[in-house]
Amino acid sequence: MQFKYLFTVIIPTYNCGQYIPKALDSLLLQGEYFTKTQVLIVNDGSTDNTKQIVEPYTQQYSNIEYLEKPNGNWGSVVNFVKQNQLAKGQYITVLDSDDYFLANAFQRVAAHFGHDMIVSAFYCYISPKRRRFLKPYFGKTGVIEQKTKLRTPHSQPLAKFYRHEIFHLLDPLKEKLFYQDCLLYHNAINKVQSVFYICEPLAVWYATRPGNSTTMPWNNADKFQAWCDLLKQMNLYGAGIVIYIYTMLPGFLKELKRQQLVLDLAKKPAYTWLPQPLAFLFGGLMALRTRKYIRYPKN
């Protein structure tokens, strides 16, 4: 199959007009790879001035496209791109409009084309003077032989590149529901055969942005219900110990207690990611600590 571009960057955006220029400017820092990149800005029903803010970019660069659709949340944007066959790149990645890539990141990724998925480490922005180095895989740069080792808590869509064919094999995402980005990644792990990991930060995740789903309070009904749904679906995809870790988030656990709810899972979470016997010990400890809040068939 012939591709018009090496990369397609999907930028879902909802009322992030003040942040999206940094995301777009980071793509301009990709050197010769910028002109080989298709940028799809998908406005998911914003009520701010996002359209006016990105207009200078679309007017100056023919590879930056702007599209609008009714609001349906993050998953609906990915579905929209797939259903309309908009992506023309050999590899596809999703960049949230408040995140950004570091300079020459695409050059590092392109050096490892040929794999079904290419994943890199990234920074988490905490404050102007503080950021944290996050690794979605706890190993060195190279081919990942055991895909289960990718099932770590860092399931964000950032710095994850999917081969075009793999991207279109992924399950449709739920619309009008938070946290579908995590499901995209764990679903992809089940679909890919070959994964390459780059153990250096190639992007920055703005986790602390006011107003995003990460900073919303847990008593927000939409957030709480979406998190419950996420854990159940991640469990079906085989996310393993991550289910326990995500359940142990203080705010979520407190809300489970307040509502006197139990999370019903279709199966017991597998002891993935950590090496044996550490996985068994850690998984056992997490299972013990969450036994009042997680329920699954014993057989």
Swiss-Prot record:
SUPFAM superfamilies: Nucleotide-diphospho-sugar transferases. It comes from the Bacteria. Transmembrane segments: none annotated. Pfam families: Glycos_transf_2. InterPro entries: Glyco_trans_2-like, Nucleotide-diphossugar_trans. Keywords: Glycosyltransferase, Transferase. Its EC number is 2.4.-.-. GO terms for biological process: biosynthetic process. The keyword Magnesium does not apply. One of its GO terms (molecular function) is hexosyltransferase activity. Belongs to the glycosyltransferase 2 family. This is Uncharacterized glycosyltransferase MG025 homolog. It comes from Mycoplasma pneumoniae (strain ATCC 29342 / M129 / Subtype 1).
